[in-house]
Amino acid sequence: MAAELGVPVQFRIKHTRHAYLIGNILDLGPLGIEIPIVEEEATVDEALEAFYYPQVGRRSWGGAARYGIEGRDDRLAYADWWNRTGILCLQMESVRAVTTVHKLAKPGVDCLTWGPNDLLYDLEAHPEHPFKTVDDCVRYALKQLEGADAKISFRNYSPDQRNKYIDMGVTVLMESPRP
């Protein structure tokens, strides 16, 4: 239905350990994939392999519903187009992810998305950690990623928080729809 309307879809996989299935999910038509609770470089490596076609990754060829395939009959041309167009996102939902953000934001990772509520659970579990707030974590990550290609996406939920995060350096905001 989204494809019929020309609306790109981003899909959040169900679990971090399902990163190996990204290629199969992308064959169904989403433009982007979001992986929850990423903390390990190995997860990022697995995601990159499954997301990108050779010679960047190892994604296999297939799926008539793939995003952007219509009108792109040449295998190499489509793979090149996809490797430049698809959107790979990692969710930053723990203090561990934040403190290793420079290792997780590898080339090919387009966006680091913030689940502030899950990150709050982890901050509450580590009350002695120097990061006390989600905003502390966002500021730290932005500093660590200066000059990197990966962008930070934040779920600010309402427009009244928009300027605060833009001023911090966040470039992608997710807000709840207005009634």
Where are these regions (language model features)?
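Short beta->alpha connector loops
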Residues: 15-17, 93-97, 157-159
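Hydrophobic faces of well-ordered beta-strands that scaffold small-molecule active sites
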Residues: 9-13, 33-35, 88-92, 112-114, ...
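Non-catalytic positions within long, well-ordered alpha-helices that form the structural scaffold/packing
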Residues: 26, 105, 163-167
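Conserved anion-binding
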Residues: 20, 28-107, 116-118
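Alpha-helix-loop-beta-strand connector modules within alpha/beta enzyme cores
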Residues: 1-18, 23, 27, 49-61, ...
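Glycine-rich, proline-tolerant flexible connector loops at the mouths of alpha/beta enzymes
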Residues: 114-133
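Short, charged, surface-exposed secondary-structure boundary motifs
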Residues: 42-46, 122-124, 179
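Short, electropositive alpha-helical surface patch
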Residues: 162-178
